[in-house]
Amino acid sequence: MKIILRKDVATLGDAGEVVTVKNGYANNYLIPQGYAIRATEGTLKALETEKKQQARKIELQRTNARELAAKIEQMTLKVLAKAGESGKLFGTVTAGDIAEALKAQGVDIDRRKIHLEAPIKALGKYEADAKLFMDITAKLSIEVEAEGASEE
């Protein structure tokens, strides 16, 4: 029997694939558990339509991510933190702090998508990566300054 997988099944394939299995396996396990549906002419057409819509959606997201990456790479984020006389911070600058600085400049990125090579524990200039989409990553330029320091 031909079926369309609705969920990933380790021994058969990924969601959306059309596979052939024995009737008993399909009728007694895969279909009742919601792992698959019968592959009829109508469901196959619906699957093709769904795949086309998904491809368009992914391409739109990829285009938006590229534009956002170009915008982010032009920015230099200024993060204010409490620091001692030697330039050492009281605490660390986290991905959450960087996400807040981005949000202040009109870019909303989840803090979990920002990757720091090492914790930021001193004043200075740093770089971080922000994963915007599957294969699109933007470089962030971060400048950590002392809170309350007068700009001259």
UniProtKB/Swiss-Prot annotation:
The keyword Iron does not apply. Keywords: Ribonucleoprotein, Ribosomal protein, RNA-binding, rRNA-binding. One of its GO terms (cellular component) is ribosome. It holds the Pfam family Ribosomal_L9_N. GO terms for molecular function: rRNA binding; structural constituent of ribosome. GO terms for biological process: translation. InterPro entries: Ribosomal_bL9, Ribosomal_bL9/RNase_H1_N, Ribosomal_bL9_bac/chp, Ribosomal_bL9_C, Ribosomal_bL9_C_sf, Ribosomal_bL9_N, Ribosomal_bL9_N_sf. The keyword 4Fe-4S does not apply. Belongs to the bacterial ribosomal protein bL9 family. PANTHER family: 50S RIBOSOMAL PROTEIN L9. Binds to the 23S rRNA. This is Large ribosomal subunit protein bL9. It comes from Chlorobaculum tepidum (strain ATCC 49652 / DSM 12025 / NBRC 103806 / TLS) (Chlorobium tepidum).
